[in-house]
Amino acid sequence: VVDYMLEGKVLDASCPAMTVTNEALRKVYDNMDYFSKHLTLRQSEVANSPEVIRRLGVIAMNTALECDLYGNENSSHICGSALMNGIGGSCDYIRNGYISIFTTPSTAKGGKISAIVPMCSHIDSTEHDVDFIVTEQGFADLRGKGPLRRAEEIINNCAHPDYRPLLREYLKLAPMGHEPQHMRAALAFHDTFLRKGDMRLTDFSEFL
């Protein structure tokens, strides 16, 4: 964001705190005349105020570690237990903003991990609070859609092509219901990665 501000791509910024690299902090100090007019630090009671966020019609963009087929997202825990990030004020923004967007690369670790999974290993934001999921593959607009339509959008538009057949296979295995899930296979991607080191090696027959 510091570079975007210096390039004129972001005009102003407001935040309760700054956590930047030493290099970015040096740029702020070296351009203090500019940043003193365009960067505002406010206490979290103001920056994360639901009333202020709603009144401004904020477009909330947050980062996810993984998203599942129905629009739930995990932004904090790896494989359900290892803490990677805190959620900060994201819940204040996604629930009160005009639009909530979660972004993530479709894969990690050279393709061995899919960010689109049958079921998240941990959930920070539920399907009720997520409007859009965006990866480098495209975006899924989840607004006003039922579970199966959301799943189709996410697979077709957000999942990496290497994982789309596996995700479609999971949907076929899941028993019918409002939100189809196969309890033994729901975390097969994660289990396979922990055992074999690559989610692409998932064989659902091992979980049936």
Please annotate each region the language model reported.
Residues 1-208:
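Conserved alpha/beta enzyme-core scaffold
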